[in-house]
Amino acid sequence: MPNEKKPKTKCVEYLRHAEYYDMRSIFDELYARSQAGEIFENLMDVILSRENILLAYRNIKSNTGSITPGTDKLKISDIGKLTADEVTARVRKIVKGAKNGYTPRSVRRKDIPKPNGNTRPLGIPCIWDRLVQQCIKQVMEPICEARFSNNSYGFRPNRSVENAIAATYRLMQKSGLHYVVEFDIKGFFDNVDHSKLIKQLWSLNIRDKELLYVIRRILKAPILMPDGHTEHPTKGTPQGGIISPLLANVVLNELDHWIESQWQCNPVTENYAYRENAAGCPIQSHAYRAMRNTRLKEMYIVRYADDFRILCRTREQADRTLIAVTQWLKERLRLDVSPEKTRVVDVRRSYSEFLGFKIRLRKKGKKYVVQSHMCDKAYKKVKASLTKQVGNIKFPRKGRGEAGEVRLFNSMVMGIQNYYQLATDISIDCGDIGRTVNTVLKNRLKSGKTHRLKKEGRDLTKMEIQRYGKSEQLRYIAQSKEPIYPISYVQCKNPMSQRRKVCAYTAAGRSEIHDDLRINTFLLLQLMRAPTYSRSTEYADNRISLFSAQWGKCAVTGKKFQCISEIHCHHKKPKGIGGSDKYENLVLVLAPVHELIHAVDEDTIRSYLTALKLDTSQLTKLNKLRTLAKRKPIDLEKPNLTNNSHNGMTKETKKSV
C-alpha cells in the first residue's frame, strides 16, 4: 500500500464515541429542544435504546474506574464477554423488568484519605448499576447543559480548572473586584436533599416520571460500609457514582442563576444593546455603568463543583453577600456552610485559596496584578509525596522494579507541573520543592562513594526533548538509564478562558474542537448494527474502533471497503489458541484476504493470490498475520508455496462480521 499521509484531525473522545453509535444527532436534538424550553416526558425510550446502552458500555470501558469492582465483584470485562443483545436485554430488565421497579444493588463504601487527616467517603456502585447510570447521564447531560450557567466549570464537557482560574484572574485583575467571599459547604455530597433535587430536575423540564423514579432509587441505594453493616441514606448522593457530578451541578445551578440575577444577568441589562467579544461573551459595559448608580450589589460567581467563590467590588457588598448566600443556601437548598472556612478576603492584603491555588493582587505601578502560588497544603503534600517516591526508587516495591518506580516518579512530576503551572509563581514553588527533592535524590541514590545519578542515559523521546531537553538539571539512573524529570524545570502558563462558542451539542460549537469522521459513515453504521450472533460486546465494540482507525480500509491491501459483506474481523492470535477479543488482537481485512490468512491448501492459496495480486509490502503484512495464526508464510519463489501437510481452512474464516 503506498504511503499515504493521513490528515490530522481534531478529536474529542466522547464525541467520537457518539458518532460511532449514531447518537450525536439525538443528543443535538435534546440540547436544542431544552434551549427552546420544551418539556421532556418520555426519555426512557432513548435511555434504553440499543445504541445508547452500547455507547454507555464503550464510555465506561474507556474509563480507568471500570476495573474497580462493586459489591458484586464484577468488572466491565465481565459485561464485555456477553453479546450485545444480552447486554441490552439485561439493562432493560434491570430498569423495567424487576417486580418492584428498578432496585440498585448496595454501593461499596471506601474511605479515601484527605490531606487534613480526614477521609472522603467514596461510593462504588456495582458495574451493572454504573452502566444504567451512564445510560441516564448521556441523555440527561445535553438537556441540562442547555440550562446550566456559564459560570460553573466542574464536571462539564469542554470546561476545566484552567477556565475557572482564568475567570478568577480576570475578575480580580481586569474587573477590579478585590473582595473574595470564600464559601465551604459542609459535606455537600452527603447532604443533598433528595426531594429538592427531584424538584430541580422537574424545573429543568425533565418530567419523565419513570426516569425520576429511577433517579430517586439511585439516590437511595443502600451503602455497604467497610465494617460490613448496611446503611439506607435519606439524603446525599454518593461520590463515585457516574451520575453524581451531573446531579451536583443540577443542585447548585439554582445558586448560579440566583447570583447572576443580582447583577450579571439582572433584567436591567435587557434595556441595553450589547455586542460580543472575540470569545463570544456579551459586552455589557453600558448596562453595568447604569446599574452602578442603583442599589444593586455587584457580584460574580466562579464555581467548580461544590467549591465556589463570589467576587465583589466593596467590603460592604462582600459582607452582605456572605450573609445573604449563607441564608439562601440554608433556606432554598437546605445546605449549611462551615463558619470557620467561610470568610471575606481582601486579595490586596492576603491570599484567597481556590482549587489548590492561593491567589492575591500585588501593586505594580498604579495597578494591581495577580500573584498566585500553590496553596500551602498542596505544597507540603507535593514535597512529601515526591520525597517518599524517591525512597521507592532506592527500594523498589514488589513487582515494579527500579525503572517502574522512576516512571511513576516522572508521571507524578508531570502531573504536578501540568496542574500548578497556572500559578504565576510556580517556578518559585517548584524551585523550592526541587532543592529538597534533589538533596534527597543525591543522598538516597548513592552506594558508598558511587553516585547512581548520571548526566547521560537512554535517548529521550520527542516529548521529553521538547519539555526537558534544555534542562541542565536532567539526570539519569545509572543502571536503568531512565531519566528523572526535574520538578523545578517549569514555567507559568497563562490560563485560557472558556470559549463560549464551543459546544458539544451544536454543529458550529463542535467544529471548534472536533472534526467529523472522514470515512464512510454509512458503512460504519451498518457495521455497528450488523448482527454479531454469539460474538462478545467487546468484539463488536472494538470492530467499530478498527474501522475508524483503519480509515475504512483493509489492513493488508489498503483498499476501501465497499459493502458490509467485504469486511471480515480477524483475530491475530486465534481464540482457539488463547486469543482474545481485545482491540490489539483484532484487525479488519477483506473477505478473500481473511480466507488467505487461514488457507493451507496450495490450490486455494494460488487462487486467492491470483485474484488479489498482492505486492511485496502487502505480502509481508499477510505473512505476518499468517505467522501469528500459526500458518506457514507464503513464499512465491518456491514451487510449494507452504510446507503444510494438511488441507482445508479453519472455522475462523467462516465467521465474518
Regions inferred by a protein language model and the residue ranges of each:
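Polybasic, low-complexity binding patches
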Residues: G576-E584, L596-E637
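Extended C-terminal regions of large enzymes
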Residues: I433-T436, N443-S534, K613-Q618
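Conserved pre-catalytic core of RNA-dependent polymerases
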Residues: K5-T9, A18-I242, L246
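A conserved non-catalytic segment of reverse transcriptases
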Residues: K220, H229, L333-K398, G404, ...
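Conserved polymerase palm-domain catalytic core
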Residues: S106, N150-N151, R156, N163-P339, ...
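Short cysteine-rich loop/turn motifs with clustered Cys
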Residues: T537-H568, L590-P592
